[in-house]
């Protein structure tokens, strides 16, 4: 009579970086012979990977822990909210264990203590690319953990610590395994991608027997040699970022940069403890476009930061008009427990925050709609994400999954997720595109 593998349920919340942590835990669980359960009822215990960045995320995480306790009763908590174990235990004293983020060993120790693995399990081999939560054709590639910045609105360093870069050999081996498994797009993520290697003084590592520096430019060049889409996220606008723009112009990596600028007013940027200035950022953006005219620049901003005046906000709107960014997200400032910004004077009233958010989005939507309209008639390469009847849903090089727009492509016969196809853009709105197979002469 064969022994049955112990079963672990898993709930993953939060950002792509948290998803990457979840994938590592799931991979280790499978490597040790644990089965992964898709339901509370069938699981012997449940691991909940939490988010704790803003109050709404804390509430969602606590609700998820409560649901897992109610439905299963045996719960291990990890992730960013786990860094505040007192908050978790005060709300849910019945949890088995609480660990912080990026804590694979601690999670596995807690699992072993509460659900011992089989001594000699007969398990399926874990694939080289590991267990993934994303679709098979794209994957997040985390290159570092933590952050050396101390932005006044952010508590990430207190939860995830200072910057720790992965060795470039490990990153490239993971990337190769993903590509060999059929991944068509690698999304490079971290807390600060442009700082990759700073903590190890850009130490030289090895990949396939070749020396490669632990540095963003060298990493981008190496990833580009794998022959798949490579998309760069969470890039601070440091001067050395200029080095990867020619790689985009040459088609080695996607002409796409996710650059979190957060504001444009010098006074607010200083209060936020953000690097660079709006003037430098604008000059750098213009220089990038000179080198690579097709570059897509995504950014995020915060309105209603403590002390933000009408003049500061107008400065931000002026920057939007001048920068003509392609993809933009914006949030009304929300106090985060433990953030230095909570102590700043002159908080902005909530109704005014929402008014500014609406005005900001109105300006940006006009910019985005015009940029989308200019794509009508162009032939674009589209990565297929999904098939819905006779229609395919995909993305261009200008669109990251989940946060940007999509392309609705008619005539999906024979297509499947992961395919790269040429399509002619026939219509647009401020977010999405509609396309058809290119007209034949």
Curated annotation (Swiss-Prot):
Q: Please report the name of this protein according to its UniProt entry.
A: Ribosomal protein uS12 methylthiotransferase RimO
- Enzyme Commission number(s) of this protein: 2.8.4.4
- What is the protein's known function? Catalyzes the methylthiolation of an aspartic acid residue of ribosomal protein uS12.
Q: What does this protein's record comment on cofactor binding?
A: Binds 2 [4Fe-4S] clusters. One cluster is coordinated with 3 cysteines and an exchangeable S-adenosyl-L-methionine.
Query: Can you give the residue ranges of the Radical SAM core domain?
Result: 133-370
Q: What class of enzyme is it?
A: transferase
Q: Which InterPro entries match?
A: Elp3/MiaA/NifB-like_rSAM, Methylthiotransferase, Methylthiotransferase_CS, Methylthiotransferase_N, Methylthiotransferase_N_sf, NA-bd_OB-fold, Ribosomal_uS12_MeSTrfase_RimO, rSAM
Offer a single GO CC term for the protein.
cytosol
For [4Fe-4S] cluster 1, which residues are the binding ones?
15, 51, 80
Supply one GO BP term.
tRNA modification
Q: Which residues form the TRAM domain?
A: 373-439
What residues does the MTTase N-terminal domain cover? 6-116
**Primary site of residence:** cytoplasm
What keywords were assigned to this record? 4Fe-4S, Cytoplasm, Iron, Iron-sulfur, Metal-binding, S-adenosyl-L-methionine, Transferase
Report the sequence similarity comment from the record. Belongs to the methylthiotransferase family. RimO subfamily.
Q: Which cofactor does it need?
A: [4Fe-4S] cluster
Q: Which Gene3D superfamilies match?
A: Methylthiotransferase, N-terminal domain (3.40.50.12160), Nucleic acid-binding proteins (2.40.50.140), tm_1862 like domain (3.80.30.20)
* CDD domains associated with the record: Radical_SAM
Instruction: Give yes or no: UniProt keyword Transferase.
Output: yes
What reaction does this enzyme carry out catalytically? L-aspartate(89)-[ribosomal protein uS12]-hydrogen + (sulfur carrier)-SH + AH2 + 2 S-adenosyl-L-methionine = 3-methylsulfanyl-L-aspartate(89)-[ribosomal protein uS12]-hydrogen + (sulfur carrier)-H + 5'-deoxyadenosine + L-methionine + A + S-adenosyl-L-homocysteine + 2 H(+)
In its UniProt record, a GO molecular function of this protein is: 4 iron, 4 sulfur cluster binding
> Which residues does UniProt assign to the signal peptide?
none
Compartments it resides in:
Cytoplasm
Q: Which residues bind [4Fe-4S] cluster 2?
A: 147, 151, 154
Organism of origin is Methylobacillus flagellatus (strain ATCC 51484 / DSM 6875 / VKM B-1610 / KT)
